Amino acid sequence: MSTMIEVRDLTFAYPAQEEEQQQGTVALRNVDLTIEKGSFVAVLGHNGSGKSTLAKHMNAVLLPSGGRVFVAGMDTLDEQQIIAIRRAVGMVFQNPDNQIVANVVEEDVAFGLENLGVPSADIRRRVDEALAAVGMEEFTRHAPHLLSGGQKQRIAIAGIIAMAPQCIVLDEATAMLDPAGRREVLATIQTLHRDMGITVVLITHHMDEAILADRVVVMNEGSVAMDGTPTEVFTRVEELEEMGLTVPDTVQLLHRLRAAGYDVPLDALDVEACADAVFGALN
């Protein structure tokens, strides 16, 4: 795989809020991270761990105080590359209402393309394809404000897809959704990754969401504390708990069964695999 995003010794401090403060809050400290094209990476951490600050560096919403961030080989500190960087990496944020800019779904999805001066025929095709990709093609003429939270986030994702990015970063994109909305958005993300080969970076505090990824990065106090497959990360239960993180229910169950003497695999992380493992151990 080739590199999509490369973070080199990244340090970032938010500006001081008061004049008497000499230094701002340091949110990231010497972070090194490489994300390969076509991968699905979940970034976990409690509030204040630096995960959202890291996400905002991935398409130059924030710029490094120290170190470098490269997106598809482009340095985010190079002002001439900012537009190309933001076209390469699209971002979906936490509040779906803050991302709606039009009164009709298809117009909202077309907004970015129109600003780029894309020909009308191409806009029509790309909007239709993007809405189909997120399963919202039947809502073309609907008013976005009448949609559910999950549907609004899927519209936001469609607007990003229409711009043909190489990577999508979702910064706590399911945090304000009900369980049904979360399932809708997560299913959409999985489809885009599997069928379109889009690189996905999922910033989340929901452990069960991270199970879906190929790789899990855990942030703590502005640094990378863990980096590995979901199985590698979630078997380090005590370390995660020390960082204020609770492992998925499936992991807790498997560890309790193992402690009770049952021969269950610790890598059966999703609900279906866990159920099969428990059934097999008890029979």
Model feature map: region roles:
Residues L44-H46:
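The feature captures the beta-strand-to-loop junction immediately N-terminal to the Walker
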Residues N59:
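Helix-to-loop junction immediately C-terminal to a conserved catalytic motif
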Residues G67-L77, I85:
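Conserved ABC transporter NBD signature motif
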Residues A121-F139:
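Conserved ABC ATPase "signature" region
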Residues A143-L147, Q151:
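Conserved ABC ATPase signature
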Residues I168-D171:
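Catalytic Walker B motif of ABC-type/P-loop ATPase nucleotide-binding domains
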